[in-house]
Swiss-Prot record:
GO biological process, one term: translation
Name assigned to this protein: Large ribosomal subunit protein uL10
Assigned protein family: Belongs to the universal ribosomal protein uL10 family.
The organism of origin for this protein: Pelobacter propionicus (strain DSM 2379 / NBRC 103807 / OttBd1)
HAMAP family assigned: Ribosomal_uL10
């Protein structure tokens, strides 16, 4: 590959890394072809881009982006997973493969919003509910006070009617 091709690859990867919400690095050494194919398919289903990229070129592409802090982890065979939408779903898929006892897939590090994540933090991210579940929970908690307020407002006229009915019944007895 000539210098111009390498420069074009670095430019393309720099643009991808600049757009990324999260980036994860892994060592894929010793993975079976079937397992690697399965990993790629699951990541594709989670809208995650997965590539094996030369470390020196990846280091150059990361310069000037939020993921510049990955440089110390660029040693040995390195695969990069780039998430543009939901970092939690990417972490879930990668953690699942990293936990597989038969596999050789090892997470190295990750970057989320410019912050470096170690393996335990990636596992913690993977344990979070998905984006859709978090949004549903947030909307439910935002809706609860309004629902309670409407319930109180609806109960006030009923309470007034019961009080007036009790007063009418008391006067009727006298």
């Amino acid at each position: 590959m000539n210098r111009d091709n390498k420069q074009e690859l670095v430019t393309q990867m720099h643009e991808r890394l600049s757009r990324a919400k999260a980036v994860f690095l892994a060592d894929f050494r010793g993975m079976a072809v079937g397992q690697a194919t399965s990993l790629r398919n699951e990541l594709r289903g989670a809208s995650v881009e997965y590539k094996v990229f030369k470390n020196t070129l990846l280091d150059l592409a990361a310069k000037g982006t939020d993921v510049e802090c990955i440089s110390p982890y660029l040693a040995g065979p390195t695969a990069i997973a780039i998430s543009y939408d939901d970092p939690v779903s990417a972490a879930k898929v990668l953690s699942k493969f990293a936990k597989d006892p038969a596999g050789k897939f090892v997470l190295k590090a990750g970057v989320l919003s410019g912050k470096l994540l170690d393996v335990t933090q990636i596992q913690a991210l993977a344990d979070l509910p998905s984006r859709e579940v978090l949004i549903a929970k947030m909307l439910g908690s935002m809706q609860a006070p309004a629902t309670n307020f409407v319930g109180v407002l609806a109960a006030l006229p009923g309470s007034l009617v019961r009080v007036l009915d009790a007063i009418r019944a008391q006067k009727a007895d006298n």
